[in-house]
Every structure is written in C-alpha cells, then in structure tokens.
Amino acid sequence: MSMEEPELLLYEAQPGDSIHSVAVRFGVIPAEVESPDPLPANQGLIDPGQLLLIPRRLTNIGPDERLIPDSELIFSPHASDFNTVEFADAQGGYLSSYRQTVGTQWLSGAEIVERVALNNSINPRVLLAMVEYIAGWVTDPSVPDGDAFNYPLGHVEEQIPGLYRQLTWLANELGNGYYGWRAGTLTDVHFWNTGSLRLAPDLNAGTVALQHFFSIVHTQQVWEGAISREGFLRVYEDLFGDPWAYEYPLFEPGVEQPDLILPFELGKIWAYTGGPHGAWERESAWAALDFAPASSISGCVLSEEWAVAAAPGIVVRSDNGTVVLDLDGDGRAHSGWALLYLHVDHKDRVPVGSLLDEGDRIGHPSCEGGVATGTHIHIARMYNGEWILADGPLPFDMDGWIARAGSKPYQGALVKDGQEVLACSCASQESLITR
C-alpha cells in the first residue's frame, strides 16, 4: 500500500444505514463506500450486516462502545408490552406518588412517562432510567423541593417546569441525537461550554442519542462518566438488566413503504403547508408533512373537509387530536408500518378499533392537539416504532408525490414526474395539490 492510500476499514452495515449517512459519519464521499456485494443504486437502505470497505480519514474521535440497541431507545415492538405504571409502583419511589395536570388530565408521574413515551415514540424504559439517573425518583421515596421538584431532569428553564415538560425536552433531545445520526446531519457532540468531539463513526443511533443528550448538559469530563459503564448504563442495568436482551431488528432487508395516497378526498384541492419537519416535537425527526384544506379564512377555523386513510388499516389510537392507523393489522402502533395523523378535530373523529379501507374518512382537519396556527392535518410514518424521515432512504411517497426537505423544517417540496409543489404556510398557488 502506498503512503497516499488510506487504510481501509471494514464496517458491518447496521439497520437504518444508507450510503449517504455512512459516508457522512466516516468523513468520506459516497463513492468511496465500497462493498463486495451490490449496494443500493439510489440512496436506499443498505441491508443490515452487509460488509462495507471505507477509507479511514478520521482522527481524534470519541468512545466507540455501543451502549444500548436502537430498539431500546425508540418505542419498538419490545416496549409494547411494558407496563410503565406497574413498574414504577413496584419500585416505590417518588415517581409513583407525583401528580401533575397535563392538558385537562390529572396524571401520575408514571402516566406522564407513559404519555411522553407514546407521543414521541421513545422507549419508556429509557425515560425511566433517565429519571432515576438524574433525579432518583424511580426508587427514592423522598419528596424533593425547590429546583429538584420543579426541574427534575436538571434543565432549569422557566418555560419547562414540571415532569411533563422536562421529559418532553429530554425526548426531543434524544430524538435529535438519534435521528440526526440516521440522517447524517449530526457528526459531533458539543459539550456544555467546553468544545466538541467527533463521534465514532461506527456507533449506532441509540448510543449516539445518549452521547448527544449528556453532552449538552455536561462538560466533557462529566460526560465521559455519564456514558461509561458506571454511569447511566449502570442505573439502566440495575432497573432492567442487559439492554441488549431487548434488541429487535428494526429494518429487515428489502423493507419498502406500502402504497399511500394523499390524505384527503379525491377531487379536492388542498395546500401543502409544511414540508418535512418534526414528527411530534418541532426539532426532532423530520418525518411529518402538513396539508391544509382550502379556506377563505386563515387561522384555526372549523372545516367540513375530510382527512382520509392513506392506506388500509385499523385505528389503534384516537384522542387529543391524534389518530394512529396501524397498517399491518396486528393492533399495535409500534410494530410494522403505522401512520400518525395530528390535529384531527374531535367532531366525527374515527374511533379506536375502526377498520378502514384506503380513502375512508379519518376526521376533520383542525388545530386540536399540539401547537398549530391554522387548521391542517399533520401526517407522519412509523416503522417498528421508528419515525421514518420524510426525505430519507425510504422517502414519503403519496400517489407518486415524493417529499423533498428544505434547509429548514417546514420547507421543501413534493415532486412527481417533473412537477413540483412547494411547501408554504401561506397556501399560495404554488402549494396547491389535488388527488
């Protein structure tokens, strides 16, 4: 080997890897990623386990120990049978007696963990372990006071007091790490007030989520302790055992999006008001798209238009402006393909248990559920509990319209056969689309 030729690294593709994301993480261009076996012709997913040859170009990288599997960071099928309330009650800590109003409901601490896990599709075991690691609330019955009560996860900010908002902030940051690694937009951790470090390129997304979260709240020295085997992982293992015992293969070889139609009725004209943006929280996985019905009045107004099922499925959730449609018919939102509809008005909203065909009515668009400035429908895809990036290796495809992201959330376009529909909250002529 000549001096000019870099050493070649042998890397085994992980579920969710694409040529683009792998190249970014290893600091090479996509053409330098090679394999003894055929690679995807487009930017699709690489089969898990496929061997890749990649030039070594990075130096001074962070720890490369994988802490938890991806399936233990997100709300994967293995989390579906976990009972958060029963577990917390059995531990006897303050979490089981904590109460807080969320929306119009009075929830226990464990119910809040359950709500945040479900909404953000983050594994409840990880959230519980974080609450224990940072606050000790899972096993310690002592009643906290002051900032320890108001800001249990240590993020002291006036806008996010209480366990619900603290956990929502945590879930968003874990998602930023996880999906930033998936998308190839995150390559470094940035420590609290003390610089940054390049992430080891062969880490998995679940581990990166933890490394990212601990970096934004700690100096590098404290961060190193948090991600060591005697840090967060020790607390997790004390509560739940070996995280790798819960490993679940999230993406099998050849996985494809099922056929989807645009989520409104045939012949209707709607506006494409939001390109790829956060599936639940605004900053996390850019998995969602927004559509709004035609209206002469802006803002949150009543609409008689209908959002419809983009594919056949069974309704497994219908509450608080939210409808989740399970596409594989097993009755579980976090196994196989599922669609999230947000901002569905309570009037005429389809109930849980409904079996829908493609094009059947879901409900009316509104501002109900979450933050919204105008009547619309927000739609996102999940596969085995993972939000699927709208402009990723499995692009959002509805009636042949393919989502393309912009440089900022909510920007972008839908493209089909040389046509382009631009995302704009203004509902301009360029944003109009019809089935």
Question: Model features per residue range: what roles?
Answer:
Residues 252-255, 259, 270-309, 341:
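Short glycine/threonine/proline-enriched tight-turn/helix- or strand-capping micro-motif at secondary-structure
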Residues 154-273, 410-435:
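Non-catalytic cell-wall polysaccharide-engagement segments
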Residues 302-352, 374-376:
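Zn2+-dependent peptidoglycan hydrolase active-site motif and core
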Residues 1-29, 50-52, 56, 68-115:
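Primarily a LysM-type cell-wall glycan-binding module
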Residues 95-119, 125-128, 134-142, 155-202, ...:
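Alpha-helical segment that forms one wall of the substrate-binding/catalytic cleft
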Residues 13, 18-36, 49, 117, ...:
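Short alpha-helical segments in extracytoplasmic peptidoglycan/chitin-binding modules
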Residues 258, 301, 308, 351-357, ...:
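Acidic, glycine-rich catalytic/binding loops that coordinate metals and/or anionic ligands
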Residues 272, 309, 313-315, 353-365:
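A structural signal for short beta-strand/turn segments enriched in small hydrophobics and glycine
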